[in-house]
Amino acid sequence: MTVAGEQGETEYGSGPEVIVQIADDVPPEHRDAIRASVQTMARRSAEASTRAVEESTAQTKLMTAMAGPLHKLIEADNDASDALAASNPSPEDYRPDTPMQEPAWPTVNLVEGKLPATELDFVASQVFGAPWHYQWQWHNGQPPTISSQDRTNGQIRMAVHADQNHNWSDVHGGFGVALRTDRVQAVAGRSLRRTDHTYFVHGGALGGNATVEGGMEMTALEDGRLVSAAQDKRFRRRLSNGERETLGFQGWTTGEGIEVNWVMLPGRTYTFNVGAWVFGEAHGGVGTASIAQAQLNGLVIALTAQFTD
C-alpha cells in the first residue's frame, strides 16, 4: 500500500514492518533503488535478530531445565520462597508509558562545503545534511514503544520493551541520500552523529536473562545491493539470575568514528544511509520474570563523502 503525504510517499513493505518515506523532489530514477536498499537492510537485520534470539532461547531452555530442581527446593522453604518472590518484579510495574516530553536536542549549525583535513587527511568532497532524501524504519518481534524519525532535521527517537511474555523487540530507523556518478570513483563515507540513551534490565532468577543493545549504523548500497556497512554500538547490557541495572540519560555524546567504503560506477544508483537501532530481549527463569527496556535518542548531523577518481 502506498500513502501520499506532504513529506513524500510512504511504502509499506512485506517481511518486517517496513516504512519508507521519500521526499517529493527525489528524481524518479532513484526511487526504486531507495526502496530496494531499505528492503535489503531490513531483511539483513531480521535475519541477524532472528538468529540471535533463537540462540538465546535455546540457551535459556538449558539454564531453566537445570534450575528446575532448585526451584522445587526453594518452594519447600518458606524463607527462600519469600526471597524469590521479593526478587521477582511484575512486568506491568516496569512497562513505561510513551514519553511525551521531547528531548533537549543539541543545536546544529551545518555549513555545507568542503571539510578541513583531519589527522587522517580526510577531506570531504561533499557534505550532506537535513532535509534528507528519504527516511525509513522497520521492526522485528514486538512493536517498539517509540519509533520516530524526522528527515527534515535528522532527529531519531526509538524505544523497546521486552519481557517473558513478549520476549524480544528490535527497531531500526534513519535517513539516506541517493547518489549517481558519470565516472568510476572510490568513495569513503563518514557521518557526524550524537546520541543519548537509557535502559532498565532485569534478568529473572533461576535461569532468566535479559539483554538491551543500541547504537548507530551506516550502509552503502548499489541498486539495492549492500556493498559496505559499519556499526557504532553505543551500549549493550546482558544480565541474568536476578541481576538488575538501571541507567538514566547521561547527556549527548558524539558517535565513534566509523567509515564505509565503496566504488561508484556510472549508470547505477547508490544509497548512502545512517540510522539507529535498539534491541531488547527477555527470557524469564523458572517462575520468575525478566525485563529489558531501552530508549535511544539520536541526531544525524551530517553525512560526508570523499570521492577519489
Spans of features found by a protein language model:
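Mature extracytoplasmic or otherwise solvent-exposed domains
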Residues: 2-309
